[in-house]
């Protein structure tokens, strides 16, 4: 799935095997990193076998899985399905600092606030820490989980690391001693797919899930503050199948001034906006729902607070929305948008349409099997057959007789002997 972000004034997007960076303010040369032409994995690098003791994971296709930007905007990291972990710095010019190798394919990346660690979560539930100051040093295992990790965040003071997994759990752990768990944030009914500690609110945590809800937490205590069912904010659907479908929250983004929160759901042509209400107790309130001409694939705020949306469209894949007069308006004539689109389109047009909309979440939903009804039906048939064989008289299920060992009775229940004293 394509993704977008900002590194200072550089607009970044990943597209299949490439990471492309385009400067939004100046006519500087774009930076392109193609994973398919990057350094290959050395033969002496250890591979991890699967749980059955079989062969290692299949050979990757060099597709970019995730990228992260450091808080200062000076560093960028990416990981691909060939298990590369690539570190760049972007100022004064783009340069690849190192290529390292992860144990298993990663699901998310994040720099800490001090920018001396790059944290990576993988599909087996492990979190590894990679040194930024020693770019050739191997990763250190920080913590493990029993389920696949899907999202990660950190407190602004680097005290806590927050991880979300496929089994609906959000865990808050101490970064320096991850075995020390501060709290759990429990309440989602499906996998947790997005996390965000919004700027300006260091004790808040926003989480999105496959159950179609977004929740606000005080993450240090694990207390839920607010919850919204995003399906209730959607327009009425004409399809009965769509009515039963829960929107999967795939991105939660906050404007730099911390006033606006944008929420994107997978395969829904809308963006939900929330604002911070500071009258009395601070809380989030639903503000607007922005209808888009196409389904969004990803979105991000730029440093000026404009929302950039990447859409599933061949003609106009990028749009900018600016907050004016209490609403979000498209800014199609923006010089930044024109400059970026001109450099962006050649890479976008080479990407197959089917690869643009690959779902990351379809296989994560829990499948429910109703075997109780079948069990009860078979049990009823068995009882009826027993009644027929017994001439219509059912044996008593309990008998009572005295015992000589001081016990009062022996009860025979369903063939099991139970002695009550």
Short names for language-model regions:
Residues 35, 42-65, 69-102, 107, ...:
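Eukaryotic helix-linker segments that join adjacent hydrophobic helices
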Residues 1-3, 58-68, 104-111, 147-153, ...:
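Canonical WD40 repeat/beta-propeller blade segments in eukaryotic WD-repeat proteins
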Residues 1-65, 70, 353, 357-420:
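Intrinsically disordered, low-complexity acidic/Ser/Thr/Pro-rich linker and tail segments
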Residues 23-30, 38, 46-51, 82-103, ...:
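Per-blade loop-tip surfaces of WD-repeat and WD-like beta-propellers in eukaryotic adaptors/scaffolds
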Residues 8-9, 72-74, 114-116, 157-159, ...:
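Short coil/turn segments that connect the beta-strands within blades of beta-propeller domains
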Residues 224-421:
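Terminal intrinsically disordered, low-complexity extensions flanking WD-repeat/beta-propeller proteins
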Residues 191, 201-213:
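Contiguous mid-protein beta-loop-alpha structural module that forms a pocket-lining wall or clamp
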Residues 15, 79-82, 121-124, 163-167, ...:
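Conserved strand-to-loop turn within each blade of WD40 beta-propeller repeats
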